[in-house]
């Protein structure tokens, strides 16, 4: 007599609660038994995700999967299960879309800007073989690491495809990384070759003797006659991209395709503290993540995608893999974010994936224009906006009348064809999301993920009009919430379970490169990755991010503080562009450093009749500080912050937190230790002010 394995019994239990009978809705053939929620104590229907019949060690039923694939985690594209690697994915695209436009750029060889010129999928395939063969010509071997140290342009993706075809490991570097970080990554990954541009070449040459593993530097956009000559004995060859192409074409090599379990890339996370960590991702990891995402969001050969987010970031990388699978045309921005709107007008993309930072700028620009347009136009916009919003809320198709009268002009700001907007990397305000949906008449979806999960952990589902959450689990993973008692978050919380978000599935990275200790800190023995983010389950199985565990600290009285939660509240203040919350175990209260919005400050000062010579002087005016802190307090009360979570003092600064002043990571997260040191004097003064004005000492 044969006994079923635990895995088989678990699968049968799940299937027993699923009705696979035919329905009119062919988009999803899996539906939960109508009696499941009442007949079973552990398997119930949520609109977008399901709770599995898996009892955890804690005795709780707390593992969620996407409703679209509850019985099996997705690891391959459902329509093309033969695609197991990035190489397979590109081969599929070339075979299917060889003559289609693929890579477009406005930047001419002489540096001038014109119309987009395009390379087809077939042409890109030919170039990737030449680049791969050129690397072999220079002694780069299968399994060696190859660096990419330049901003988005067609050559970046060609090199990445070459790495996949010949089983090299691609290692992207942010072009904004400082010399020390670049040096660390090159040495830590033991890079054999690195692709750069003339600007980043100068950085590499400044410490060439300190990166001994490098044997080949390829300069993209540089002419051979302008390349520097290196002294004999360095062991390093510098060639132009065009020369490498020529060398490769003269000696083409057959591909050396990787296996799904082979390393595809090592992505170095910028990190808010310490040195960068190398996230090891396999071909199987990346394919699984994008395949899972494709179950819900689909790209088509008719789509045009604008690429401006750093390709060194996993968000943009995953979008490109999805684009290849769908045969999408990718147009690159000209390299200047301040001219991005001009690129939109010329490219007229249908897909726009960005971060809240830019969406907020679009929102501010449109609302500012509406406010200054006059009473009649402002009122017309409000009527059109509210009418369209109400239709969306009620599940009706908004009248095209309002688009013709009001919104088509706004749509033209992004080229007039955008059908899909994606947002990630940080939370998008619900107000901004609703605004984008209404004004641009397109699908706007927010996702949540991290480099260690190959990108997407969860994303909003098509047709879900509720904002303020990050959707249901990617069909390629399962999610659970783990109690964090020190922050008073538990999966028993009512009305919504809360806890640290943990993820498991084929999307989970293999570990940090050469760092077993930090790998063990984030990845447990059962394969669960602990994200450090705090989430809750909303009705319908939607995940909402509410806090951050990793950056918590204690105040003197023992209360735990999650600064990012508080900063997200305060950045809604009209005066606040950026906010840094500081506290420590020596003080019982928090203080805030606020980078102000210059235009709002100037307008407010003018309305109050306050005279000043420069923005710095205005920031130091006690009346201004008092007003800003009062508005921050109002937002804190509205968000129901606890008493000890309120900032008791604020310092206003005219300059923004930037990559250049060392206060932000390349993904625009605050570097807390650096910010603490940078603003040490201001922090000390604020605590002195609190102590002087409060009979109860702030220090314990």
Curated annotation (Swiss-Prot):
It comes from the Eukaryota. Residues 19-29 have a biased composition (Polar residues). InterPro entries: AMP-binding_CS, AMP-dep_synth/lig_dom, ANL_N_sf, LC-FACS_euk. It holds the Pfam family AMP-binding. Keywords: ATP-binding, Fatty acid metabolism, Ligase, Lipid metabolism, Magnesium, Nucleotide-binding, Peroxisome. Residues 1-29 are annotated as: Disordered. It is an enzyme of class 6 (ligase). Its main location: other. One of its GO terms (molecular function) is decanoate-CoA ligase activity. A motif (Microbody targeting signal) lies at residues 10-18, 698-700. ATP binds at residues 266-277. It is found in: Peroxisome. Its EC number is 6.2.1.3. One of its GO terms (cellular component) is peroxisome. Belongs to the ATP-dependent AMP-binding enzyme family. This is Long chain acyl-CoA synthetase 7, peroxisomal. The gene is LACS7.
């Amino acid at each position: 007599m044969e006994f079923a394995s635990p895995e088989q019994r678990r699968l049968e239990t799940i299937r027993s609660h699923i009705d696979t009978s035919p329905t009119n809705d062919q988009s999803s053939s899996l539906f939960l038994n109508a009696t499941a929620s009442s007949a079973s104590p552990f398997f119930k229907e949520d609109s977008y995700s399901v709770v599995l019949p898996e009892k955890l060690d804690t005795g709780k039923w707390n593992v969620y999967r996407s409703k679209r694939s509850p019985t099996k985690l997705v690891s391959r594209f459902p329509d093309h299960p033969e695609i197991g690697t990035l190489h397979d994915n590109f081969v599929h695209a070339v075979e299917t879309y060889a003559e289609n436009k693929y890579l477009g750029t406005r930047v001419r060889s002489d540096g001038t800007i014109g119309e987009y010129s395009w390379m087809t999928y077939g042409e890109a395939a030919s170039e990737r073989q030449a680049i791969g063969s050129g690397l072999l010509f220079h002694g780069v071997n299968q399994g060696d690491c190859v660096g990419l140290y330049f901003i988005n342009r067609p050559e970046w993706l060609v090199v990445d495809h070459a790495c996949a075809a010949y089983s090299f490991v691609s290692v992207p570097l942010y072009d904004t990384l400082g010399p020390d970080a670049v040096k660390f990554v090159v040495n830590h990954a033991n890079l054999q070759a690195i692709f750069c541009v003339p600007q980043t070449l100068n950085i590499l040459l400044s410490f060439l003797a300190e990166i001994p593993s490098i044997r080949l530097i390829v300069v993209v956009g540089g002419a051979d006659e302008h390349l520097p000559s290196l002294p004999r004995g360095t062991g390093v060859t510098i060639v132009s991209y065009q020369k490498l192409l020529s060398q490769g074409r003269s000696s083409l090599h057959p591909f050396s395709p990787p296996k799904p379990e082979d390393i595809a890339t090592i992505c170095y996370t910028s990190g808010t503290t310490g040195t960068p960590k190398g996230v090891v991702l396999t071909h199987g990891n990346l394919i699984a993540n994008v395949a899972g995402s494709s179950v819900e969001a689909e790209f088509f050969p008719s789509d045009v995608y604008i690429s401006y987010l750093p390709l060194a970031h996993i968000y943009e990388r995953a979008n490109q893999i999805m684009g290849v699978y769908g045969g999408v045309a990718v147009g690159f921005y000209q390299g200047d974010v301040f001219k991005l709107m001009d690129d939109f007008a010329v490219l007229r993309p249908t897909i726009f994936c960005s971060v809240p930072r830019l969406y907020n700028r679009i929102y501010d620009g449109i609302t500012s224009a509406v406010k200054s347009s006059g009473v009649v136009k402002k009122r017309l916009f409000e009527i059109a906006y509210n009418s369209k919003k109400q239709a969306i809320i009620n599940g009706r198709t908004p009248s095209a009348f309002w688009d013709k009268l009001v919104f088509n002009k706004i749509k033209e700001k992004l080229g007039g064809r955008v059908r899909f907007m994606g947002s990630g990397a940080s939370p998008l305000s619900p107000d901004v999301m609703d605004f984008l949906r209404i004004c641009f008449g397109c699908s706007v979806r927010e996702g949540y993920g991290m480099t260690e999960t190959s990108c997407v952990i969860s994303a909003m589902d098509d047709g879900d009009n509720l904002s303020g959450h990050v959707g249901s689990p990617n069909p390629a993973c399962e999610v659970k919430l783990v109690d964090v008692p020190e922050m008073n978050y538990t999966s028993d919380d009512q009305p919504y379970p809360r806890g640290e978000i943990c993820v498991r599935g084929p999307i989970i990275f293999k570990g940090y490169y050469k760092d077993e200790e930090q790998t063990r800190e984030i990845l447990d023995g059962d394969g669960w990755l602990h994200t450090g983010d705090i989430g809750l389950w909303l009705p319908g199985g939607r995940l909402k991010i509410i806090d951050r565990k990793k950056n918590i600290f204690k105040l003197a009285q023992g209360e735990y503080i999650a600064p990012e939660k508080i900063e997200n509240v305060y950045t809604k203040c009209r005066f606040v562009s950026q906010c840094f919350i500081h506290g420590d175990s020596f003080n019982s209260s928090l203080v805030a450093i606020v980078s102000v919005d210059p235009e709002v400050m100037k307008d407010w000062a003018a309305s109050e009749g306050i005279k000043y010579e420069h923005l710095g002087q205005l920031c130091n005016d006690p009346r201004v500080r008092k007003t800003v802190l009062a508005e921050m307090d109002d937002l804190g009360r509205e968000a129901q912050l606890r008493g000890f979570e309120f900032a008791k003092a604020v310092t206003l600064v005219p300059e923004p937190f930037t990559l250049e002043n060392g206060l932000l990571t390349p993904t625009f997260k605050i570097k807390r230790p650096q910010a603490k040191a940078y603003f040490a004097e201001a922090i000390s003064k604020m605590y002195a002010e609190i102590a002087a004005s409060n009979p109860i000492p702030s220090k314990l």
